[in-house]
Amino acid sequence: MARDFPLERVRNIGIAAHIDAGKTTTTERILFYSGVVHKIGEVHDGAAVTDWMAQERERGITITAAAISTSWQDHRINIIDTPGHVDFTIEVERSMRVLDGVIAVFCAVGGVQPQSETVWRQADRYSVPRMVFVNKMDRTGADFLKVNNQIKDRLKANALPIQLPIGAEGDLTGIIDLVANKAYLYKNDLGTDIQEAPIPSEMDDEAAEWRYKLMESVAENDEELIETFLETGELSEEQLKKGIREGVLKHGLVPVLCGSAFKNKGVQLVLDAVVDYLPAPVDVKPIQGVLPSGKEDVRPSDDNAPFSALAFKVMSDPYGKLTFVRMYSGVLSKGSYVMNSTKDAKERISRLVILKADEREEVDELRAGDLGAVLGLKNTTTGDTLCNTEDPIVLETLFIPEPVISVAVEPKTKGDMEKLSKALTALSEEDPTFRVSTDPETNQTVIAGMGELHLEILVDRMLREFKVEANIGAPQVSYRETIRSSSKGEGKYARQTGGKGQYGHVIIEMEPAEVGKGFEFVNKIVGGAVPKEYIGPASNGMKETCESGVLAGYPLIDVKVTLVDGSFHDVDSSEMAFKIAGSMAFKDGVKKCNPVLLEPMMKVEVESPDDFLGSVIGDLSSRRGQVEGQSVDDGLSKVQAKVPLAEMFGYATQLRSMTQGRGIFSMEFANYEEVPRNVAEAIITKNQGNS
């Protein structure tokens, strides 16, 4: 089957920003103007096409990353609309991993918010080229150039306006295109009657000044263009487009556009800019991976290269399990067998679909650069690589943050027990930041996630989709344990109870691993001191012990274990004996490695009238918070701080009381840090008292 669009004319883009910047409305308008939908859906009406889960339509927020295909100017545009709420950061993370370009949406009034910085960092992590749409220019207090300066100052981006608004707030009547050097005036409310016109005379000087800055910045990134610019003082529209595109692809420029998606102004120009400036799959670096030999390799965006794809999302719906994939190379055909190289398992491709939010179009194949979904995969989860059996490769995977908050959950009736188990399995397959465990002391099921809203939504889904009624406990902080020094550990398990005995013996070296590595295992056995068939069980014994820690029963993270020696018995050794020996060696080693307790630290931003600044800072300090920055603008103070999550329960009520109901705050996970000794001792004592 031939391609609908050449690879050069494909754009895989994401629309990302902080909550309430207008991402979903922008996506809706893109779908309306590109002909995918024929009626405009609003988030606040619960009618947005990309918000298709019941909770999304009720709450007016986007929870999951919805993938949609559309076309514009003979280009295929695959769009992922991502959530802005920090509790759903994994949805943004997995989208960034598979995208080629991003439209970052900012509110013209609110500007750069804490979540904007998080999204920007996620795009930086995967080197995703981006452009900016300053939305809500119709709102009172809208200030395009102020937001542009915030992007430069707070995000350290080379933000470059390629448009200027004509008017603002209630008088937004059009947009100046600095590249084409002309104006677009909006003549109807639907945004479909647009008149090209000369730049209004009262804005001539301002437009000329900003166009000169644009030409100067573009020329600086291109030797050929700088010569032309120095000689003539001018660049043509074609030269500017070429220069901006090259600047975006090299991460040297971020073009900034403006408009109001809600008022139907500026969205078609955003689509034009996606086509003109954001990369095709062939414009970005080939994806890197590791061959079975351990050697690094790359896969180019090419239909003729060996097939490789990354599963970036798994969803259960009434039709079965959907696995979203980003095709990096080759062709994937319906009915074929492929390899899950991450799990070393074979998979059959029963059906392939391209999605338009909650509608789907069946296709016979997916090709390099496509975003699509596979039905019928049995073993594949988020972050797994799919590839040809003849050309195995494991692609770079996703960064998955540790959960920070947990609650106990129990079914209301015995009849709900099995349904709860099925629901939790399905939800944890979909969402890698959602973890399920059993408390060994109380035997309660414990679920952990990225925040209270995250867990609230998941519990809501259990009731709606899986018909499970459950009682939920009070939220608890998800502490972690780690080690600070290196040591050796030894575990010998020998039992003789008549007949065949049990024997396993391992010696390990243990040291702190890089942050984010979790549990890292290295086998350095030589000369068969431990036979190959017992190395896996020994490693599994250690990994399982990791889950319950040694200080207070919390999972142990960022530990590197090297298996260096051991011994075995020809008759008495078994997999179980080596699993137990591995666990014993691990516990022995951890105790000697200065184990410490870690707690989730939250990045908190508080806004309040400046009269309350002293009270806000004093209160944050009393919560073991570290104030990292503060500012006062027009009588409004902003305080940025890092505060332990354990100290933030009940903060909303306290802030309202302190600021007479005029303070607001946002909070997101920052990192795990060591708990101060006196606090750690109290937590450890409490947990040991409960056991």
Curated annotation (Swiss-Prot):
Family annotation (PROSITE patterns): G_TR_1 (PS00301), G_TR_2 (PS51722)
Transmembrane segments: none
GO CC annotations on file: cytoplasm
Primary localization class, coarse: cytoplasm
CDD domains: EF-G, EFG_III, EFG_mtEFG1_IV, EFG_mtEFG_C, EFG_mtEFG_II
Keywords from the named record: Cytoplasm, Elongation factor, GTP-binding, Nucleotide-binding, Protein biosynthesis
Molecular function as annotated in GO: GTP binding; GTPase activity; translation elongation factor activity
Subcellular location: Cytoplasm
UniProt superkingdom: Bacteria
Pfam families for the chain: EFG_C, EFG_III, EFG_IV, GTP_EFTU, GTP_EFTU_D2
Binding positions (GTP): 17-24, 81-85, 135-138
Entries under Gene3D superfamilies matching the protein: 3.30.230.10, 3.30.70.240, Elongation Factor G (Translational Gtpase), domain 3, P-loop containing nucleotide triphosphate hydrolases, Translation factors
Record GO biological process: ribosome disassembly
SUPFAM superfamilies: EF-G C-terminal domain-like (SSF54980), P-loop containing nucleoside triphosphate hydrolases (SSF52540), Ribosomal protein S5 domain 2-like (SSF54211), Translation proteins (SSF50447)
Ranges for domain tr-type G: 8-282
UniProt xrefs under NCBIfam families: EF-G, PRK12740.1-3, PRK12740.1-5, small_GTP
Function, in words: Catalyzes the GTP-dependent ribosomal translocation step during translation elongation. During this step, the ribosome changes from the pre-translocational (PRE) to the post-translocational (POST) state as the newly formed A-site-bound peptidyl-tRNA and P-site-bound deacylated tRNA move to the P and E sites, respectively. Catalyzes the coordinated movement of the two tRNA molecules, the mRNA and conformational changes in the ribosome.
Family statement: Belongs to the TRAFAC class translation factor GTPase superfamily. Classic translation factor GTPase family. EF-G/EF-2 subfamily.
Name of this protein: Elongation factor G
Gene label: fusA
